[in-house]
Structure formats: C-alpha cells, structure tokens
Amino acid sequence: MKKLTFEIRSPAHQQNAIHAVQQILPDPTKPIVVTIQERNRSLDQNRKLWACLGDVSRQVEWHGRWLDAESWKCVFTAALKQQDVVPNLAGNGFVVIGQSTSRMRVGEFAELLELIQAFGTERGVKWSDEARLALEWKARWGDRAA
C-alpha cells in the first residue's frame, strides 16, 4: 500500500480522509497504521529559522566563542527541549542528544523562533530583513502559521 497523507483544513478534507480509511480492507496479518498529528514545519519556516540563526551567529559571542548557525541551532533546540548530553565515543568531548528541527511540529517550531527572538533581542541583535519578516510572521500567526 502506498503512503497517504491528508492535510485537513476543512470538513471536505476530513471526509476525504475518512473515506480513504473506510476503503482499507483490514487484514490481521498486515496491519495498517493510521497516524493523526500536527503538521511538521514547512520549508518556509526552515528558511526563516536559518535567517534568525545567521543573525545571532554574526552578532553574539557565547562564552568567549563565536558559534556558527548550525551550532546555535543545537544550543536553541537543546534549551527548548531541555536535552541531555553524553560523552562522545573518544571520551574527549560531549554530544547533545536531542530533537531534529525537521521533525518539529508547527507549534514547536514557532516556540523555537520565539526563543531565538527573545534571546537575540536581549543581546541587542539587529535582525536582517529576512529574520525580521520571520519574527513578524511568528507574532502574527503563532501556532497557526503555515
């Protein structure tokens, strides 16, 4: 069976999803999994994230070091998700155990942007046009954002 995904935005979309499930013939030897979840973050949200991370990476020194955008992403997601660290295999450093932003739901992603905005604003970050648009988007749409 091929994978089906329904984005439910209206009663018509909901009925399409219900109809698709009703067409499945149950087979105890081949169970089918149906998952209902909030949509994951979009490519547009991801672009906005990297604009904000880029601004922070160019303007904020962290404990005497300048971090790249990827490192800042790890710092912010670890703070948001209260992640843990474990020693690396060589025993000469640590690895953050955490969540990938690509698996975040829209609401979680909005929280991440809010955290970055608060952190950057506290430290006087001057937001680029793209980052400013991302933060305005978050303020306007919050958890409902596409």
From Swiss-Prot:
Disulfide bonds: none annotated. InterPro entries: NinB_sf (IPR036619), Recombinase_NinB (IPR008711). Gene3D superfamilies: NinB. Belongs to the ninB family. This is Protein ninB. It comes from Escherichia phage lambda. The gene is ninB.
